[in-house]
Amino acid sequence: MITAIEITSRAPFVGGATFGEVGAYERLDGVAIGELDPAHPANRGIVNIDKAPRSAHGNVEYRSDICILRPADPERGNGRILYEVNNRGRTLLFANLCGGKAGNQPQTTADLGNALPLRLGFTLVWSGWDPGAPRANGGLGLDTPIATDNGAPIVRRIREEFISGTRGGELQQFRLNYEAATQDGAVLTVRRTQSAPRQPVAFEFVDARTVRLAQGTRPELGSIYELRYDATKPRVLGIGFAATRDIVSHLRNSATGRDLLGRQPTHALAFGISQAGRYLRDHLAQGFNRDEDGVRVFDGVFTHVAGIGRVFFNTEFAQPARTRTWHEDHGFPEVEFPFATGELLRGDDTKVIETNTSTEYWQKGASLLHTDPDGTRDVALPANVRGYYLPGTQHGGKAGMPRDAGPCTNPRNWHDPMPAIRALLVALDEWVVNGREPPPSRLPRIADGTLVRAEAVAWPKLASLVPPRAADDVVAPGDWTDPQPPSHAWQPLVPQVDADGNEIAGIRLPDIAVPRGTFTGWNLYKAPLPEGELADRDGTHLAFATTRSPDDPRPSLAERYPTHEAYRERIADVVAELQHDRLLLEEDAAACLARAQD
């Protein structure tokens, strides 16, 4: 439960700017202080909570950063909470959903993009859930206790993986998730790909949380460095689930929450992108969508680009920032059978929308959300779940994505799926508040041939289009500290394509339905990264030729669209259909039509 919320800063948001009929917003920053009874049934599933130090009341204490954006006049808001789960301490709502520039500290309205959630009148809430999340630049963190064995340090041999230049900049040294109990016996190896043999590497400890290669050497770009060492001081990470649960429940149901928000919220929705979406899947699966009194926390949950993943979190010495793709983070526990969303809900009737892109089918086993584990038949979703596929889109797709090749073989995918996500967020809100059902699920299916094995995808014959060897495996989790060959693997499937190489099923936004090129959710690395390996998150865009080319079997732009007016008419038809199906908001429809004029 929450014992106090201490507000340390309260100010007009972005200079008192107004957002439609809702008007101005206030920003409140502070700390939520909570404590948990380890014996309470709602908390017993938290790993090592029984090994955490206790307060004078016999409870386990925690402190979470919290940020609230509330209408300055609460009665002009819609009376509902939209809680965004942060991604490694970062808020993504404005930068991704809204097409803005903001990180955690927006300063101007330009940082907020279209500011849709504010114009809709939501009270926005963020809080810390990961003790390892960086707090720099306004990052949101959580303070939890260190577990011990009756006061003695817990020490365990664990494994960590580091790769320079793929998910971030070049690494000069490696920062460990945990403190090394001893430097003795630690072993560092390197391999170029997941299947290559490990080779020992000389290294040294800089301090108990940092290692580097021997003086004069730097990590090879893209190679997999693996450290095995004796770690100590594991925090009780699973408290993060309880912190989210208790903060939202407190804001919804307590007098303190009413005073902070200016009114009693009627409903609460949760939204999470990537890691944050996987966190929400795990939050549901582990039963944390009911508070200690059994009251539902979130009435609606929206996960975007989570695939079938959960988070490596409620485990001793867990590392929640890890996520498996073709080249990275194999052997860490992230997936857990059963995968289908209906199995996560544990009888909870919260309404769920899940959206995934092409990348999640190639890299994150997303097909297993709606097929049997062997990939032989489609499985129906429960009545309170909708699933939507965003074809021709990469994992991090949003407005303003780069179009050059970057670290990849092909030019990167710039398709923006967020117009559909915005429409579906509105649909989830309507579903929760007044029972208006959202559009039917739009997913690739085995039955109609739009979901197939990777080797059955009918790619057009292009010299520049070299498809992946396979989709990434989905395997049974084992001992993550010393992985062995998996005991079982499930069968992920991927979306089938048309003659242009564009995927057939799902919500085909105008750039896919009336294409000027081929969009995929995958790309391949080029040197100096491991050449030919499936890139971590990047997709591909291969533009059509302007006029007929003997080297390109795809019709040229001139053949498809004899006049600009013909192109505009086709865009208008697609926009009208998407609006009719409630998959495109009016403002986004107008923007699509305006772009088609260019």
PLM-predicted stretches and their roles:
Residues 1-598:
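C-terminal His-loop and adjacent cap/lid subdomain of alpha/beta-hydrolase
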